[in-house]
Design a protein with these regions (language model features):
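Alpha/beta-hydrolase-fold serine-hydrolase catalytic core, especially in secreted/extracellular enzymes
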Residues: 149-246, 251-257, 434-438, 443-538
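Mobile cap/lid helix-loop segments that gate and shape the active-site cleft of serine hydrolases
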Residues: 369-429, 450-458, 464-471
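N-terminal secretory signal peptides that target proteins for export/translocation
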Residues: 1-7
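Bacterial Sec-dependent N-terminal signal peptides
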Residues: 7-8, 14, 20-104, 111-122, ...
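Loop/turn elements at helix/coil->beta-strand transitions in domains of secreted/extracellular proteins
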Residues: 257-262, 282-287, 339-341, 362-366, ...
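Cap/lid segment of the alpha/beta-hydrolase catalytic domain
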Residues: 263-333, 373-385
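Flexible loop/turn segments at secondary-structure boundaries
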Residues: 270-272, 295-297, 351-353, 374-379, ...
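Primarily recognizes the serine-hydrolase "nucleophile elbow" in alpha/beta-hydrolase
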Residues: 325-390, 418-419
Length: 538
């Protein structure tokens, strides 16, 4: 297998399968389906979605006197799957043809009583990120909607899985002019399953921490949150030291009705560098403003380095700060934030930080780095080639990016001019976000951002999403003709689609490579940079 798991966590959600009384007509006898964990185990030998669906079939058949054929499926092909993200079922809802839906074996979702549902904790939605391993999307249940909720493994809502994985020896140098294989483990063996990706991405993270970013401290002794007047204060205590910082929250929900949220560096959606501007109009989500200078200013010092003075770069310190925000939100439901539906955005240097946040914290459901350039979603090897061809630093090079803003550890600049010796390239950092949702926004009109290395990174990163069967969770969008960090109208649709789909659970088309106004599709020659096969991970 190549990658070793020390342990496995299969945690089932508190919301177990619940199927309503058989009530197609007033004169029918009522039969209650087996809905408890123990009942499913006793009668069907297991507690999972298959046993829950079998219990529902048996309940409906029993109510019909066992006369129905066993060939019908639980979810009718003529009706949207009630587990499909964003589809909340109403009792008495009409079919697509406009006819009233009748309770029956082809329409079991019409037979469910809201009183029979075992609801999740009201403080947060219980459903998980799309395309995470071994589960399905379960839309939130409101008092006016009915959803069949089979018992499935819950989302491992954790920062990462580093403690579960054995990390091998990390090379400091290779000889490879091509893009490193994201599927080859440190032991030289390629992964073949989606489950193995969990530890492969941890290997990648460990490489980045050792060679580029510095160590991201994990599991501080205590994280506390307090919320008042639209401000969340986060206090972190670790190894005998304490520090605190605050973030602003606007358009928040309530403890009983929390809202999805976008965390924005330096203002994010609300203005400043990284603004998504009017693209977010009409979307009922909360906005969390995080000033990274409150944790680790680029000038040096700051709360993070008072707690951990280990030579890290500021980018990993910013990522640590966002992780502590999420910790505090989990413990502060009165802030009105649905922590299971968090997005992260930022532009330029904060775009680099955004990518690091999404890569190093699996609790981020949607990552939107904007115009991140070198050190973000842009390939070091391709950028170096472009500069050699131009005979000058046309694209920001490794030495410049490696020293500006103290983003990276000081030794990383030693790879300048030796990019082919890097054991990784940025397509692998991008891949760490997979299979969670990722929208990369790029600007073809700013030379130093690197139109070609950014495009090629977008193309190469897609290989991992394809391998994981998560193509629809990934979009790379490039447009020119606008200023740096000024989101153009041509990219509004991508932003809205991703937010609607991955934060609000609505139907939207995602999963594409997009070239819009004032840019041309770049000739991506895969064979020039990739000498490995993309597996179909099962």
């Amino acid at each position: 297998m190549g990658l070793v798991m020390n342990k496995r966590k299969y945690i089932f959600p508190l919301a177990v399968a619940a199927f309503g009384l058989w009530a197609c007509g007033e004169d029918n006898n009522s039969t209650t389906a087996c809905v408890t964990e123990q009942c499913l185990i006793d009668q069907y030998g297991e507690f999972n979605a298959d046993s829950a669906n079998k219990a529902m079939e048996d309940s409906i058949l029993a109510a019909q006197g066992g006369s129905s054929s066993s060939s019908w499926t639980v979810y009718s092909a003529e009706r949207p799957d009630p587990l499909e993200a964003g589809h909340e079922m109403e009792l008495g809802e009409s079919s697509s043809s406009g006819a009233e839906v009748t309770c029956g074996p082809q329409t079991p979702w019409a037979c469910v009583s809201s009183s029979s549902l075992i609801l999740p904790d009201a403080s947060s939605s219980s459903h998980r990120h799309p395309t995470s391993s071994s589960s399905v999307d379960v839309p939130p249940v409101s008092s006016s909607s009915v959803v069949v909720v089979p018992p499935t493994p819950a989302n491992d809502f954790v920062e990462d899985h580093r403690s579960e994985c054995q990390i091998g020896n990390i090379p400091t140098s290779v000889n490879n002019a091509k893009l490193p294989d994201p599927f080859k483990g440190l032991d030289g063996k390629r992964i073949s399953t989606k489950d193995e990706w969990k530890c492969r991405r941890e290997e990648i993270g460990a490489m980045y921490e050792k060679l580029m970013f510095g160590t991201k401290p994990r599991n501080p002794e205590k994280v506390e949150g307090s919320y008042s007047g639209g401000k969340l204060t986060i206090k972190v205590t670790d190894k005998g030291k304490s520090g605190s910082f605050s973030v602003k929250i606007s358009n928040a929900g309530t403890k009983d009705k929390p809202k999805p949220a976008m965390i924005g560096f330096g203002g994010g959606m609300m203005g400043g560098c990284g603004s998504l501007g009017n693209a977010t109009n009409g979307l009922d989500i909360a906005q969390i403003t995080f000033n990274p200078d409150d944790v680790a200013p680029e000038s040096g010092g700051g709360m993070f380095f008072q707690l951990y003075n280990q030579g890290q770069g500021t980018i990993i310190a910013w990522a640590w700060g966002v992780s502590r925000i999420i910790d505090a939100l989990e413990k502060t439901p009165e802030a009105g934030i649905d922590v299971k539906h968090l997005a992260m955005t930022g532009c330029s240097r904060w775009g680099k930080g955004t990518l690091a946040v999404g890569a190093f914290d699996e609790r981020i459901a949607l990552t939107i780095p904007q115009e991140s350039g070198s050190g973000g979603a842009s390939l070091w090897r391709v950028g170096a080639q472009v500069n050699r061809q131009k005979g000058k630093q046309f694209v920001q090079g490794l030495n410049s990016a490696g020293t500006e803003g103290k983003w990276m550890i000081s030794s990383f600049k030693n790879y300048d001019g030796k990019e082919n010796t890097l054991p990784f390239d940025q397509h692998i950092l991008v891949a760490m976000v997979a299979p969670r949702a990722l929208l990369i926004l790029d600007n073809a009109g700013q030379e130093w951002l690197g139109e070609v290395p950014s495009n090629d990174c977008g193309q190469a990163s897609k290989e991992v999403y394809d391998a994981l069967g998560a193509t629809e969770n990934y979009t790379y969008s490039q447009e020119g003709g606008h200023g740096h960090c000024q989101l153009p109208n041509g990219q509004f649709d991508e932003v809205k689609d991703f937010m609607n789909k991955f934060l609000l659970g609505k139907d939207a088309k995602t999963g594409k490579i997009v070239y819009t106004k004032n840019t041309e599709q770049i000739n991506w020659k895969k064979s020039d940079w990739i000498d490995w096969e993309t597996p179909n991970l099962n």
